[in-house]
């Protein structure tokens, strides 16, 4: 049985269930009034759909959602899913490709990630903030185009296109931010 949490005790990062939906608190505010109970408003993310809404939860008692986060490594991809393996137990799980629309751009063999599960349902994948990934193709640098840190387009091995400095070449490894999808630096 999951524990009960009062709406006024919710903080950023807490998870709870409401009407069969699983929410993650992004922001919360508590406005105290003189004559009545305080008003609790939370900006929440539905972990199943990814939608972000603002909910008024004044006076509610909510069931806390215990989200399990398991560290796993990417093994392979088939047509509809990505397969990850727990390096300690060797358990393999399939994550539906539709849950990884953005993340798939940064997942290569042995990429480590935190798989989020609620009971037996997979909710998503948290990648590290930065990953080392290989450039599949980079345009040649244009001679004389060195004004103001000129950038060129490069395609990662996953097919994702990023902008990189002129000195980056095909088959080089670079560090890319998974937060904004931008080039960070060369990898050593």
From Swiss-Prot:
GO molecular function, one term: translation elongation factor activity
A single BP term in Gene Ontology: peptide biosynthetic process
Keywords: Cytoplasm, Elongation factor, Protein biosynthesis
Pathway: Protein biosynthesis; polypeptide chain elongation
A GO cellular component entry from the record: cytoplasm
Gene3D superfamilies assigned: 2.30.30.30, Nucleic acid-binding proteins
SMART domains, per database record: EFP, Elong-fact-P_C
CDD domains named in the record: S1_EF-P_repeat_1 (cd04470)
Function: Involved in peptide bond synthesis. Stimulates efficient translation and peptide-bond synthesis on native or reconstituted 70S ribosomes in vitro. Probably functions indirectly by altering the affinity of the ribosome for aminoacyl-tRNA, thus increasing their reactivity as acceptors for peptidyl transferase.
Protein family according to the UniProt entry: Belongs to the elongation factor P family.
Protein name (Swiss-Prot/TrEMBL): Elongation factor P
Organism: Mycoplasmoides gallisepticum (strain R(low / passage 15 / clone 2))
């Amino acid at each position: 049985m999951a524990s009960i949490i009062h709406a006024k005790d919710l903080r950023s990062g807490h998870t709870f269930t409401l009407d069969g939906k699983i929410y993650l608190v992004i922001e919360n505010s508590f406005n105290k009034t003189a004559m009545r109970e305080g008003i609790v408003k939370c900006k929440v993310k539905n972990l199943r759909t990814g939608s972000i809404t603002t909910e008024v939860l004044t006076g509610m008692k909510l069931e806390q959602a215990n989200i399990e986060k398991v560290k796993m490594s990417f093994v392979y991809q088939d047509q509809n899913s990505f397969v990850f393996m727990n390096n300690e137990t060797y358990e393999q799980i399939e994550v539906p490709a539709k849950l990884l629309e953005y993340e798939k751009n940064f997942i290569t063999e042995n990429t480590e990630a935190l798989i989020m599960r609620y009971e037996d349902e997979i909710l998503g994948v948290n990648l590290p903030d930065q990953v080392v990934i290989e450039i599949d193709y980079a345009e040649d640098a244009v001679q004389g185009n060195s004004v103001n840190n000129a950038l060129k387009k490069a395609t990662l091995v996953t097919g994702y296109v990023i902008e990189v400095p002129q000195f980056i070449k095909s088959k080089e490894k670079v560090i890319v931010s998974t937060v904004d999808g931008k080039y960070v630096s060369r990898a050593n």
